[in-house]
Design a protein with these regions (language model features):
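Conserved class I S-adenosyl-L-methionine
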Residues: 2-8, 99-126
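Class I SAM-dependent methyltransferase SAM/SAH-binding core
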Residues: 13-54
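A short acidic, Gly/Pro-enriched loop at the edge of an enzyme's catalytic core
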Residues: 56-66
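A short glycine-rich, Lys/Arg-flanked "PGG" loop and its adjoining helix->strand segment in the class I
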Residues: 82-94
Length: 168
């Protein structure tokens, strides 16, 4: 049976349907409230509270597939993001896959700044720099990355990007 780890599982958007399809799913969620909601939705998911940067509950090479769909755009520093990738790599079996979600800078600029006509406002407010990179403030909920940021993280973690599936 395929073993899946959902890191930053939230309320179970992915882990619950995957468990219902018959996969052996383990979920890890930082926020206690979200974890409670996930547990209410399904008793088929093994759900734990924990941090994406420290997957100490799990052994090396334990999962066939590791999903990291929430943490990477909530983690602020490159060090935290690298720690999360390294931990995902550690718990994923050789030949397994790690799927990671990021919020892409360019997509956000195109949809918010250009399409919704907020370029001038974004620059004046300091949300965009002169190279149209989204700047982050300490209390921002999300962090934005460019493709070169992902490539640098992957290189540091000795991971290879197979493909980008969608922009979000």
């Amino acid at each position: 049976q395929i073993k899946i780890l959902d890191v930053g599982a939230g309320t179970g958007r992915y882990s619950v349907p995957l468990a219902e399809e018959g996969y052996d799913v383990t979920a890890l969620e930082l926020v206690k409230h979200n974890l409670g909601r996930l547990k209410q939705k399904s008793d088929k998911v093994k759900a734990y509270q924990g941090n994406a940067t420290k997957l100490k509950k799990f052994g090396n090479d334990e999962f066939d597939l590791t999903l990291v769909f929430g943490p990477m755009y909530h983690l602020k520093s490159a060090e935290e993001k690298l720690a999360a990738l390294n931990e995902a790599k550690r718990v994923t079996k050789p030949g397994g896959y790690i799927l990671v979600a990021y919020i892409m800078n360019e997509y956000s600029v195109i949809t918010y700044a250009i399409k919704e006509k907020h370029i001038k406002e974004g620059i004046e407010d300091g949300m965009l720099d002169e190279s149209f990179h989204c700047t982050e403030k300490a209390n921002d909920l999300y962090s934005f990355v460019r493709l070169e940021d992902i490539e640098a993280l992957n290189a540091q973690a000795a991971l290879t990007r197979e493909k980008i599936i969608a922009a979000d």
